[in-house]
């Protein structure tokens, strides 16, 4: 036997059959038996035809004890206890009524007082007491697998150690914990409409901390150019001043997609600030608006360029929407694997915006209203639960998502009503 120790945690390896036991002060936490750590080929035709790592996967199965319950794996709107669920760690824009998630975190913890973090940015597939009801399985494509087993002994100790590894959020300012009011899907509004919303809250005795302008503060199909639509907001500076005089903070909707009609598109294209196709063309699609491009945050100059546009709006906070629909066939400035970047892109996006606020306003006042996330994204608070319906069933879904996310290392979370 080979024993590796770290504090109260030990890994005991049987060198004959490569089974493993994870123990805390001699007590078994979880184990990997014979063939639980596997190298799998999905289309193997024999040694003569083997093509190396193509269609290869690494899989690990770790044992569950009697009555052991699994939590976490990001913001999931499915049942809070994850036993019996198949989970894909792959960011999608699926709302709160599906098994998809905006914030996929390859980390789970159990009521036995330990956690497991699979250290891969790409897709990780979990089988939580499904393929075998006494095991949690997880697999990644390729020929290597990197994961951490994190000791407690209490569940909150697991989260502390996990965030020691991946980062901790700062404490948001007190005003951020108040009620936020949004234009949401109201697409035809002007200053008069906005003021009627705000005044209507005060007239009803409802305290209001933040007013949020959703996408239509900019001209339609010009998302994102960071320019107020002068047709309905001819005096944005004056309007913002009048809102602040009421003691209300301001948040505006942004994303990292630049539509072809945006004033920024030509500049970004000429300077190489967008994701590209293999032939060197700008990667574009029509999912949100015609011909949109996506800012390449692996390019330091593109990041500075995007941040410079935000600095013009620094009297406001930012709702960093989207960040999930990231292509897997794009070419990045730094040569990054686009499959691994699909989930990780949102980290760079939110980091770029948060850094501007932190530099200009200080850590105490830096605040996002972000929808997408990956492991480590908790360092850029705060996150919200995405698109939901205004009914009790959807509230239940959202609350399950928030509980799962805060079981995955995120300290702050909000949701729509």
PLM features per residue range, with description:
Residues 47-52, 89, 99, 188-198, ...:
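Short, charged low-complexity intrinsically disordered segments located at boundaries
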Residues 2-174, 182-185, 191-192, 196-203:
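Catalytic and substrate-binding clefts that recognize carbohydrates or anionic sugar/phosphate headgroups
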Residues 170-184, 281-294:
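N-terminal small/glycine-rich loop or linker at the start of catalytic domains
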Residues 32, 207-417:
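Aromatic- and carboxylate-enriched substrate-binding clefts and catalytic-loop regions
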């Amino acid at each position: 036997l080979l024993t590796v120790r770290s504090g109260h945690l030990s890994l005991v390896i049987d060198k004959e059959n490569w089974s493993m036991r994870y123990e805390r002060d001699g007590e078994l936490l979880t184990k990997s038996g014979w063939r639980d750590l596997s190298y799998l080929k999905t289309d193997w035709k024999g040694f003569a035809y083997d093509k190396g790592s193509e269609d290869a996967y690494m899989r690990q199965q770790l044992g569950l004890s009697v009555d052991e319950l699994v939590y976490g794996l990001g913001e999931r709107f499915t049942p809070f206890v994850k036993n019996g669920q198949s989970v894909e760690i792959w960011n999608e824009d699926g709302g709160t009524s599906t098994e998809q998630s905006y914030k996929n975190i390859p980390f789970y913890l159990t009521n036995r007082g330990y956690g497991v973090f699979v250290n891969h940015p790409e897709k990780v597939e979990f089988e939580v007491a499904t393929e075998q009801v006494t095991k949690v399985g997880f697999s990644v494509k390729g020929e290597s697998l990197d994961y951490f087993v994190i000791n407690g002994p209490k569940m909150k100790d697991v989260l502390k150690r996990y965030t020691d590894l991946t980062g901790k959020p700062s404490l948001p300012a007190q005003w951020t914990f108040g009620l936020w009011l949004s234009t949401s899907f109201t697409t035809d509004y002007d200053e008069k409409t906005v003021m009627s919303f705000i005044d209507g809250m005060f007239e009803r005795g409802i305290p209001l901390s933040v007013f949020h302008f959703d996408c239509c503060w900019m001209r339609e199909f010009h998302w994102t150019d960071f320019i107020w639509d002068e047709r309905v907001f001819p005096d944005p500076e004056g309007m913002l001043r009048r809102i602040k005089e009421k003691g209300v903070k301001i948040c505006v909707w942004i994303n990292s997609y630049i539509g072809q009609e945006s004033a920024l598109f030509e500049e970004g294209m000429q300077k190489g600030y967008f994701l590209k196709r293999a032939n060197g063309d700008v990667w574009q699609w029509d999912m949100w608006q015609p011909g949109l491009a996506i800012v390449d945050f692996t390019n330091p100059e593109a990041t500075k360029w995007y941040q410079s546009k935000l600095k013009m709006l620094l009297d406001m906070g930012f709702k960093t929407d989207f960040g999930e629909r990231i292509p897997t066939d794009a070419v990045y400035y730094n040569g990054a694997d686009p499959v691994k970047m699909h989930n990780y892109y949102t980290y760079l996006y939110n980091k770029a915006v948060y850094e501007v606020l932190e530099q200009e306003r200080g850590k105490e006042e830096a605040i996002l209203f972000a929808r997408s996330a990956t492991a480590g994204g908790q360092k850029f608070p705060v996150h919200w639960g995405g698109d939901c319906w205004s009914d009790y069933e959807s509230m239940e879904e959202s609350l399950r998502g928030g509980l799962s996310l805060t079981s995955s290392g995120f300290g702050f979370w909000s949701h729509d009503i």
